[in-house]
Amino acid sequence: MSTGPIPPASEEGSFVSAPSFRSKQRKILHLLLERNTSFTIRSDFPESPKDKLHDSANLSILSGGTPKCCLDLSNLSSGEMSASPLTTSADLEDNGSLDSSGPLDRQLTGKDFHQDLMKGIPVQLLCSTPNAMNHGHRKKIAKRSTSAHKENINTSLKALEWEAPRTPRFRKMPGGPLTSPLCELEMKHLGSPITTVPKLSQNVKLEDQERISEDPMECSLGDQDAKGLSLRKMVPLCDMNAIQMEEEESGSELLIGDFSKVCVLPTVPGKHPDLKYISPDTVAALLSGKFQSVIERFYIIDCRYPYEYLGGHILGALNLHSQKELHEFFLRKPVVPLDIQKRVIIVFLCEFSSERGPRMCRSLREKDRALNQYPALYYPELYILKGGYRDFFPEYMELCDPQSYCPMLHQDHQAELLSWRSQSKAQEGERQLQGQIALLVKGASPQ
């Protein structure tokens, strides 16, 4: 057992490995010794890792070279790569596997470059996970597949080309060392399989990155699917009443007044949406008996003044130009069909079927409603002849008696026109007064 002083373990390791290392790469050792000298001489370290990498990036660009003392390339020939972190100079001296293939006289300006490089790059290696290479490979494939649809990608996320695995260790690491372009340049120069590194914007924090999807397209499509599903769920809840009202309104256009059956005659659009219009062809078919299998009795009410009616009217039409006469004719003794499967219909017309005919039709319906309990009616099926007698006469003159047409404003009947107008206005005023009195009585009666 030797009695001499035992040298420290670090010195002994250096003594054993130094000769073999100097015999292989003397100049590389000189470069490493120069780096160790920079460790001892410099005492004021940068304040943050971000500032260190910023200085390192500038030195790398000015020198035109790339340091090659951070990655183990001994297994590149077999397609594998060692991801063990190299954090101390002792580890580099022990394995000695970083070989430089460039010129040996290439020097980097700045003595603190190696210190910054060794403090910046290992952070990335420590943050990596075993599937980091596969993750980067998947991102490269996704970028190639979506390169043809760049206009669909949000421009605010273009700075995020690759996102590191979200492990707890990664979230705790500062974002400064990952923002330097030095690592990407070095990996590309060395031919490392890890050719894509994160380029995070300075304004984006790591906590915010956790809420961003790896693929902006996937995020937007997922959001759209979720929104579409929520909308499909919300529509029946919010618009159910509106949809039902629309269906009822569209269906009510085809139903008769008591909503029990569909209109037996084909209807056409008219001036007043609340009324049902039929064409002159339908009236002609009605007169010829084409609907007798479903209609037991029909009435054609000519609402024009008597001189107009006598000047020419539809065969079988009744001249009832006042509401009082109309109510007495139909409501004093309502007409009920003998066959419950058949119907009783009423067709109203005037010269143009614009004012007088629709007004008489509404008057009969209002009075009928008042005499029955909703929705029951004596006469649920009322129609208006579209275009009136003026449109019917030229097409079906043979169905008119006499075969002539006397307009309301005929110059030979001016006095009669004034007389009938005054009477109709008086009757209309009396009807409105009676309606107001009925409302007052209804409001004053106890509930």
Swiss-Prot record:
Catalytic residue positions: C350
Matches recorded under PANTHER family: M-PHASE INDUCER PHOSPHATASE 3, M-PHASE INDUCER PHOSPHATASE DUAL SPECIFICITY PHOSPHATASE CDC25
PROSITE patterns associated with the record: RHODANESE_3
Function: Functions as a dosage-dependent inducer in mitotic control. Tyrosine protein phosphatase required for progression of the cell cycle. When phosphorylated, highly effective in activating G2 cells into prophase. Directly dephosphorylates CDK1 and activates its kinase activity.
UniProt-listed Pfam families: Rhodanese
Post-translational modification N-acetylserine, affected residues: S2
Protein name in UniProt: M-phase inducer phosphatase 3
Organism from which the protein derives: Mus musculus
GO biological process, one term: cell division
Regions of compositional bias (Polar residues) in chain numbering: 81-90
GO cellular component terms, A-Z: cytoplasm; cytosol; mitochondrial intermembrane space; nuclear speck; nucleus
Entry comment describing in which tissues the protein is expressed: Spleen and thymus.
Record InterPro entries: MPI_Phosphatase (IPR000751), Rhodanese-like_dom (IPR001763), Rhodanese-like_dom_sf (IPR036873)
Molecular function as annotated in GO: protein serine/threonine kinase binding; protein tyrosine phosphatase activity; WW domain binding
Highest taxon above the source species: Eukaryota
